Amino acid sequence: MAAAAARVVLLPAARRRLWGFSESLLIRGAAGRSSYFGENRLRSTQAATQVVLNVPETRVTCLESGLRVASEDSGLSTCTVGLWIDAGSRYENEKNNGTAHFLEHMAFKGTKKRSQLDLELEIENMGAHLNAYTSREQTVYYAKAFSKDLPRAVEILADIIQNSTLGEAEIERERGVILREMQEVETNLQEVVFDYLHATAYQNTALGRTILGPTENIKSISRKDLVDYITTHYKGPRIVLAAAGGVSHDELLDLAKFHFGDSLCTHKGEIPALPPCKFTGSEIRVRDDKMPLAHLAIAVEAVGWAHPDTICLMVANTLIGNWDRSFGGGMNLSSKLAQLTCHGNLCHSFQSFNTSYTDTGLWGLYMVCEPSTVADMLHVVQKEWMRLCTSVTESEVARARNLLKTNMLLQLDGSTPICEDIGRQMLCYNRRIPIPELEARIDAVNAETIREVCTKYIYNRSPAIAAVGPIEQLPDFKQICSNMCWLRD
């Protein structure tokens, strides 16, 4: 139940489209060929188009309370159903930071109808799995079960978020569990670096706070804090009941009306708007020469989920790619940065990232280096960023587009990832974006678009930097900023 970022999901029918072309391109590409092989290709294209059209529809219904019910029926014998709530650590303040994550821990500790033991036995006897996670903007509770047990799964989820007892004894017990979890997180240097990155990039704002909250808050959060958070944020318009697998939308809708129809209240007036989180180019350095490797993240401000430039930044992120010493390929890797890194033995690993929130985001790279190669690796990274702004080629962009589409489809394999994709997209876009539409938007990105968008968000922009470990060789912040617009070899 550790804090996690929201994931994406898809389904078996989509796996048949790993080539990644849109319908229109497939049909247009086959048209005009009159040879025997051309006719065969045309028949194959028509069959492939039917596969695309047979992808199950995502049905969406909004109840009077504002609760959105969304589902995709793929006829499987299992299903995943969950509640996606527009409430995470960003909705907290300094005093109650950590409450959303604390609530996630309390979800399975008993309700007015079920003790913790009863809840665990019921889930086990169903052969189901019950889980939850918290991110900076969302809280999720979901269950994976047999399709025939969908009614019981929905009833249990409704019971958990509406009738949790939040007993004092359980609160004290979970307080200790969360403190131990915090100790585990502090040993994961990647999580530590990303928390530092948010803290410096969004300093003095809600996104700058951690999901778990500070130790003093964990020790002081009370039952009243938990109840107040539920009362304030668990409102109908901010909740999505999503399901995928062997689910009937009509049945799910009836279950939603029965279990949530009259109990979820709405906001008086408009849903409260999130205060903006201002990005600040800055740095955090935690030097520890006893550590064997330096861990560093550098990022510029990106855009929110619904921004038109999001897709282009996703392609740019794929262009940079990721690399680890365990990878093969060497100079034959598709990522130019991976080639340079491998050839120069500059780092142990690097991973590009594009983290989006409602109205802002972070686009950057995380790397793990030897102390002596930190400066050289950062220099190569920034040089590659500048190349995206000036001279990226069409062949590179085409390869990145195909890789992005493939990865996108591979992540949507099974009812759980599909359900997560539905829930997340309903909160972010208030709709499920069809795969052909998403592929068409990716295919619209070319080298010129990459250069324009990267110049807009990367060139001459002040980055946020978080570095931990033996970082004596890391250039000063002024030098790093100057390399965002001009580099001397």
From Swiss-Prot:
It catalyses: Release of N-terminal transit peptides from precursor proteins imported into the mitochondrion, typically with Arg in position P2. Its main location: mitochondrion. It comes from Pongo abelii (Sumatran orangutan). It comes from the Eukaryota. Heterodimer of PMPCA (alpha) and PMPCB (beta) subunits, forming the mitochondrial processing protease (MPP) in which PMPCA is involved in substrate recognition and binding and PMPCB is the catalytic subunit. This is Mitochondrial-processing peptidase subunit beta. InterPro entries: Metalloenz_LuxS/M16 (IPR011249), MPP/UQCRC_Complex (IPR050361), Pept_M16_N (IPR011765), Pept_M16_Zn_BS (IPR001431), Peptidase_M16_C (IPR007863). Catalytic subunit of the essential mitochondrial processing protease (MPP), which cleaves the mitochondrial sequence off newly imported precursors proteins. Preferentially, cleaves after an arginine at position P2. Required for PINK1 turnover by coupling PINK1 mitochondrial import and cleavage, which results in subsequent PINK1 proteolysis. It is found in: Mitochondrion matrix. GO terms for biological process: protein processing involved in protein targeting to mitochondrion. The active site is at residue 104. SUPFAM superfamilies: LuxS/MPP-like metallohydrolase (SSF63411). GO terms for cellular component: mitochondrial matrix. It is an enzyme of class 3 (hydrolase).
